[in-house]
């Protein structure tokens, strides 16, 4: 099979590898598509803690080709979602039991469009940020800063939770998408936001924006740091403001969510995608093969387009 694997910082190689054989407790899956995630690009640029070689794709859809020994409840030909680091390849061996880096396979209906199906994991991630970390309640005001592919999913997650959502995003087209997804307002700069918010989610890895997000927070509000900050993870904050107004600054990282939360949010995300309440395929702006993955990473770095779907 062909696969794209990282061998070090900025060292991505498309390789011919032996087809994997499913071990006991595993499924052999032929991968139909995989979403390109900004975290994959961070691993490419800054290094991977999981070791090398690494196939960082983790938003993938495929069909079962073979069953390993002892596997029950799965059949050849079934369609599934996988979130292990294996998605940038033609084939993957997927454990059926959840592990530290995987929720386990999730059965998908055949009629769910491929461009929508790849969003199960990232949309669940956004639900975790909105529900568990921002703790937004119906009718509360949520400001999402940054309208990239994840920021727009955060907008929709907030809308589905009943929040009054405002998007801050400089690009006209992305602001328009935010309004289409249900944001009540979309402005181009933080200075255009009036009043205070019950929660602010920062979806841009720019430490200079953290203090400005805190300034927007109402007493008792939560500021959620959704993006990673790369090699510049520093910010200055008015600690008296945090103290006297009881403002919480929290992170949101899907891998850090407890397994029970992840199970719940996977189910909610899949239900929203299947029902059409989360018609996120409009965020897919490019497609590529394995040989085009490095160009797709460059597009993410340059903020070109939104979501790229890799078809191996």
Residue ranges and their predicted role:
Residues 18-35, 45-87, 109:
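Glycine-rich beta-strand-centered segment in the early N-terminal region that forms part
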Residues 82-145:
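NAD(P)H dinucleotide-binding glycine-rich loop of Rossmann-like/cofactor-binding domains
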Residues 134-136, 176, 181-248:
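Glycine-rich cofactor phosphate-binding loops and adjacent beta1-alpha1 units
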Residues 151-152:
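N-terminal Rossmann-fold NAD(P) dinucleotide-binding loop
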Residues 160-164, 219:
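Conserved S-adenosyl-L-methionine
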Residues 169:
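Conserved acidic E/D residue at the C-terminus of a beta-strand in Rossmann-like folds
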Residues 233-284:
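C-terminal substrate-binding/catalytic core of Rossmann-like NAD(P)-dependent dehydrogenases/reductases
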Residues 263-312:
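C-terminal hydrophobic helical "lid"/dimerization subdomain
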């Amino acid at each position: 099979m062909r696969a794209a694997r990282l061998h070090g910082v900025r060292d991505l190689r498309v390789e011919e590898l032996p087809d994997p054989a499913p071990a006991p407790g595993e499924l052999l899956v032929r991968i139909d598509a995989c979403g390109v995630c900004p975290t994959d690009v961070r691993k490419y640029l800054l290094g991977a803690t999981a070791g090398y070689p690494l196939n960082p794709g983790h938003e993938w859809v495929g069909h079962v080709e073979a069953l390993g020994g002892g596997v029950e409840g799965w059949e050849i030909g079934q369609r599934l979602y996988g979130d292990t680091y294996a998605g940038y390849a033609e084939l993957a061996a997927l454990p059926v039991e959840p592990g530290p880096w995987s929720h386990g396979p999730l059965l998908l209906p055949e009629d769910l469009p491929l461009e929508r199906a790849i969003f199960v994991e990232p949309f669940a991630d956004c639900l975790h940020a909105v529900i568990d970390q921002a703790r937004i309640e119906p009718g509360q005001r949520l400001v999402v800063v940054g309208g990239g592919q994840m920021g727009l999913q955060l907008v929709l997650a907030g809308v589905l939770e009943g929040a009054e959502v405002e998007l801050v995003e400089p690009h006209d087209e992305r602001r328009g998408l935010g309004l289409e997804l249900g944001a009540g307002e979309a402005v181009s700069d933080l200075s255009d936001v009036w009043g205070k918010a019950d929660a602010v989610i920062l979806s841009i890895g720019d430490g200079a924006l953290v203090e400005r997000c805190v300034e927007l927070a109402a007493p008792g509000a939560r500021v959620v740091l959704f993006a990673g900050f790369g090699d510049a993870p520093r910010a200055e904050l008015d600690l008296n403001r945090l103290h006297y107004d009881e403002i919480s600054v929290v992170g949101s990282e899907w891998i850090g969510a407890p397994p029970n939360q992840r199970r719940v949010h996977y189910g909610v995300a899949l239900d929203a995608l299947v029902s059409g309440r989360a018609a996120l395929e409009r965020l897919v702006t490019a497609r590529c093969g394995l040989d085009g993955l490095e160009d797709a990473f460059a597009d993410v770095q340059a903020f070109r387009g939104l979501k790229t779907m890799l078809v191996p």
